Amino acid sequence: MQQPQAHYLVLTAVGTNRPGIVNTITRHVSSCDCNIEDSRLALLGGEFTFIMLLSGSWNAIARIESTLPVTAAELNLMIVMKRTVCEPKAPYPAMVWVQVDVDDSPHIIEKFTDFFASRNLDIAELASKTLARAGQVPLLSIQIAAHCQNCALEQHSVIDDFHALCQKLGAQGNINVAVHSQPEQP
């Protein structure tokens, strides 16, 4: 018997953090016969944000699309849902990871995301946190992971350019480029 085609939904829930709220959401997802394929949770100020990639039959996805807004209203949550597709992607030949500590100021994160965008590096993850320091400007800590198509050829220039950007901004930064071996083409 053929497996039914899976359908996918990206769901984001944002609301005031409180004990048990994530369990309530995941219980609702399960009750609709959806599977959580991937998820991220973050506490930002007094709010939480929960992002999930759900899979299920067409009926299961339609069920969560129609019932979650009622549950979200009861829980005082803001939700965003969007259907999507999940197709196997060709592996990227390389990954780039950076970690930066720098005095916080406006536009710092933008300068690093621009560094990645201008080199056609596809940001896969970005995390940042501002840390208070007694009598000093707060410290901004940034971690970014990105996929890279051309790093096997341009690895040294990416590394050199990253260090030059850190020096220009007075940042302490580390970069790691991992080039994956590719299967030989027949």
Language model features: what each stretch is:
Residues Q2-P186:
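A conserved regulatory-domain signal marking ACT and ACT-like small-molecule sensing domains
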